[in-house]
């Protein structure tokens, strides 16, 4: 007799355990099991956040690796070290294959389970934003037609999320603010549209400021943190010393990504 499949509760507990141990690949596996077992039912807010945090950490490590390797590649190219450049390109390809696999995994899960089963506006925006995020991560390293396709898919997902967020969520809602933050980063980094990026970030910030007094205690910390990130990016993007600043553009960190 084969052992019984772990229950939904057991998988959630194991995901929390994996998070504590910083074993994020396994955390992803546990939360994917939860997402697949619920089928047509929605994930709870806690489950949704655990899934987001798991994937954010798994993808975050590779994105950081890719940036470091790409930076070294540029330096070696400028020095004319062709042998090193060839080795680096191969290694970068390995990281890109991992990035593609991770993004494909969560995007399939979003399309097959998470987006179709979401009914509440908050969860719809959350998952569509997530869909946009992972298409954006693909656009960061893809080139040519693949990059164009990833960018178009990002725009589509973010716009769908934005339509619902503007109609259904308060300007101070952390998910609406997180969407504005990441959407503006997409305009700036992927579409090279600083004006659009600044307009979107400024509008989101101004609208939230005007309704700050309506902010509930439970989301005050998350909302004000994202507002600070929006303001940081605006300062960076509008400054004349853009190139020299060297600051990393702020996007929703894993702390707020999972809200």
Curated annotation (Swiss-Prot):
InterPro entries for this protein: 14-3-3, 14-3-3_CS, 14-3-3_dom_sf, 14-3-3_domain
Span of the signal peptide: none
Matching Pfam families: 14-3-3
Family label: Belongs to the 14-3-3 family.
Name of the featured protein: 14-3-3-like protein
Species of the source: Lilium longiflorum (Trumpet lily)
